[in-house]
Amino acid sequence: MPLLAGDSHRALDTPNVYYQNHVSCPEFDVVGLSFPGMPAFPHFGHNPWVAWCVTHLGADYQDLYIEQFKKDDSGYYKYKDQWRRAEVYQETIKVKGGDDVPLKVWVTQHGPVISGNPEQGSGIAFKYTATEGPSTWPDGLWQMLLAKNSDELIESMREWVDPCNNLVFVDTDGNFGHLCRGKVPIRSKANGWLPVPGWTGEHEWQGYIPFEDMPKAVNPEEGYIVTCNNRPVGNDYPYYISTDFTPGFRAQRVTKRLLSLERP
C-alpha cells in the first residue's frame, strides 16, 4: 500500500490559514485541512479510498500588456491596425471616516488597466486565468470528495483553474501519482519575462494547455514521487509553464533520503 506524506511548509500564521476538520454525511466522509469559509479540502485530505496533498507548482498564468490609448477620454486603444474601445466604468470607493474616492476603471480585451493613465496615452492591462470566465473549482472540489480511486480524483481536477498545484495522491487500490492541476495559457515564453506590447497581437493566449498534456505521473517505475515546488518537467516538455520554479535542492535531498532507506 503506498504511503503519502506532505506538509504545507507555510509561514507561521496567527490565526493559521488551515482549519483541520472532519466532515461526514451520507454523500461523503472526509478528513483534512480546509480554509475557513471555503468548502471542501483543496490541499490536504482523504476519504475512505483516496488521499491527496499539494505543493505549489509556480506556474505563470498571469500576463501584463502595455496598451496604447488615444490621449483623450474616448477610451480607444490600439490593436494591430485598429482602434478598439475599452469598457469604462465609474466606481466609488467608500472610505470609513473619509470622503468617497471616485475611480475610473478601464478594461481592454486583455483585462483591467491596473497601472498608467489611459487618458495620457498608455496603461498596463492585467490578464488572469481566474478572471477569464466563471470559476469552476467548486464543482471539482465536490467531485474530489466523492472520488473512489485515483482515476476519479484526476478527472475531478479537469476544470480546476487556480491556483496551479502539484497534486500528489494515493488510493486503496495501491495506486499513487502526481498531477499538475490548473489552467495554464498557451502563449509566447516572452510573456513570462516582462510586460508585453498589447497592440501587436503577437502575445495573445492560444487557449490553455490541454488537461491531458499537463504533467502527470501514475505509478512511475521508480516507485516514488517527490515534489517540493521544483520544476516538474524536463526541457523537452512542449509548453511554457514558468520561468520561476523553486530550486531543486529540497527535492534532491528528499530523493536521496528515500533511496537510502532499506525495506524491513
Residue ranges and their predicted role:
Residues M1-P264:
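Mature extracytoplasmic enzyme cores
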